Every structure is written in structure tokens, then in C-alpha cells.
């Protein structure tokens, strides 16, 4: 609920006083399994070292998130160093992994949850060679709650519960089937939900069939976190190029520049744009406001005295002059 990290493969962790060293104590008895459910090995601290080295050697796309964080990793990735032992990851013992950072990062634990930081069993990696990680059941070694059972491109992906998963009692879905949708027939998704083929399907609030679906399934419709985003749209107050504009004369260019430098003009643009109407083109009238943001975080991220940050700002702005009221 509050975004707190809950250990899984690790039981606990500690941070050095200078914030540079993170030490993780691994859960004992967690096993690797093949796609057939056969026990392969125990998950050990060295698997995390192997995993990071594999990502670095393979120039993983996710490296940019961590390579400037972990001591020596950027140098290894760039080729400045070819000695991975200089990289700030170490298996202290079978159940203790230690990471050394270049500088303190209070958000470091959130990076540990990314795919680049996952463990890799060295023996399995070497046995598979270039086929390691292939999107087939046998190309993957498993320590999580599900096995990949099948993957057909542009068709379906199927998973089955790992009966030996260490936390299996908290895994309540036995089979997962993900069906491919090509983005064409939006009505087909709702039909598959209605006939029981899907247990979850996306609805499109701007489709012709949505009003009827909303009445029929009003208690089943939920809005997922809205992440369709346009970042940092601003006014160019130092315009130099007029290549892609109808403003061609010096007088027109001068007038344009004066307008852009005028605060009232810029505010008029901001206040005149009907963001709700714009957002409703995708989310419909009822869901439009769920897309709107004035901040990089949800409006409820900071609250005090029963009011969220946006409400507090609105109350304060009226005291700052007529231009904000």
C-alpha cells in the first residue's frame, strides 16, 4: 500500500553508516528448478555476482540504470577494466551478497528489483551457451512462483504455478494465460471477457459499445495507474528558428518573440488549453481527470490536515494576488 519493499529472495539487509555498502542476507533453502520442475541447485550469493557479470558482458539494455551506481561497473562495461573482481559486488559467503556504491543512493533498493540485478546460475548459463534465456521453457532456470509452459509469438504466453516455490502458499493463481491482441478489434476484448475466455480485459471508454458495457459491468470496471504521459511541455521563450512556421517577415518574428516573452500570454496559453477535453479523447469523460497531472507525482503523494498538495496550493494561491485567483 505504501510502496515499502518486502524482501523475497533476501530475508533482510543492512546499510553501512556512510551509505556506500549494502549487505543482503539471502533466504536459505530457495531452489532453482528446470521447466520440468526438477530441482537443479540452491540459490546462492554467487548467483548474483554471475548475474551482474552476465548483464555487463552482454551489454544489457538495463545497465544504464545501475552502471554509474556500483563501484567499478562503468569502467568494466566500457572496457577500461577487464577485471570483474574490481566491480562492487561480492559473495561474502553462500547467503550474503554485498554491493559497494560510488556514492550514497537512498533509492538504491528500488534498483535491486530490476531485471539486470537478478541472479543467474553459472552452471546452467554455461550449459546453455547462446541459448541461455531463449523464450522457451527449457531456456530458463526458475526460482520464482511460475514456470513458463509455452510462448507462441503473436499468439499466447502460458505460465503454471511452481509447486515448490518457497512462498507457494501466497500464490493463489495456478495458471496464467496472456493472449496477444493486435490492437485492431477493441470490441473483441470485451466479448472475450463476457464469454469467460478472459478474466481481465481492457475496455475503451471512447468506443461505441462502452456505455452498454459500463452499465453491465459497472462493479467490475477499474482504472489502472495512468502512465500515458507527456513530460515537460513548455514555451520556448528564446525562439531562434522559424523554419517550420508561417511567420516569415521580420515584423511577424518580432511580434512572436514579444508574445512569448509576455507572462500573461504564456499563462493564457496554459489556462486556455482544455486538458480535460483533450484527455477525454482517450479515457472518456469519466476517466479524463485520472490522466491529468500538475506534478511528477500523484496529487495524494503529499498530504497534511486531510488535504492533498494540490488542494493546499489552491488555498494559498488566492492570497498571492489577483493574477492567480
Predicted regions and their residues:
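Short catalytic/ligand-binding loop motif for oxyanion handling, primarily in non-cytosolic enzymes
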Residues: 33, 107-109, 279-280, 290-291
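Extracytoplasmic/periplasmic ligand-capture domains
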Residues: 27-60, 145-282, 301-325
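A short, compositionally biased micro-patch
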Residues: 8, 17, 92, 151-152
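Mature extracytoplasmic/periplasmic domains
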Residues: 120-129, 283-309
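Gly/Pro-rich hinge or "lid" segments in bacterial periplasmic/extracellular proteins
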Residues: 82-85, 94-95, 101-177, 187
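Surface-exposed binding/hinge segments that line
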Residues: 14, 18-25, 44-50, 54-124
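N-terminal lobe/hinge region of extracytoplasmic solute-binding protein
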Residues: 1-17, 141
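A structural "hinge/loop" feature
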Residues: 1, 9, 34-41, 106-118, ...
